[in-house]
Amino acid sequence: MTESRSTFAQQLGAAKVESTLLVLFIPSVDRDSQPIDQDTWVHRALETLGELFGGATAFPQGQGVWRDDTQGGRLVFDEPVVINCYTSETLLEAQAPRLRQFLVDMGEQTRQGAIGLVIDRDYLEISFPLREASDG
């Protein structure tokens, strides 16, 4: 924490100061544009981030698009929910295995081509192989 941020936190009487921003995108469709149970995954994400990092905030659906290069560059239009979570780099590193497990579970169970997240200014993407619908 910088000195000016520390001073500002003291002036406000802040009991907690976190400076690492984690942004998670919860999809509304799978890679074949079929709807998923987004509400369940938003709840699971909030629960996971709350347990791991102390809290998170979900924002209403937006509009997005993702290019699925595995399917010839097909565009998948989506209405993602964006979740913000402030934490510390130390806690993020300590909880990385549990966060990754949640992201992989969501990606696999909702048949995503990828799950994207942002940590501070870095966009990260976990990719999933193209599977046939019957591979369940």
Go through each PLM region and give its residues.
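Positively charged, small/polar-rich N-terminal and surface patches that mediate targeting and assembly
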Residues: T2-G136
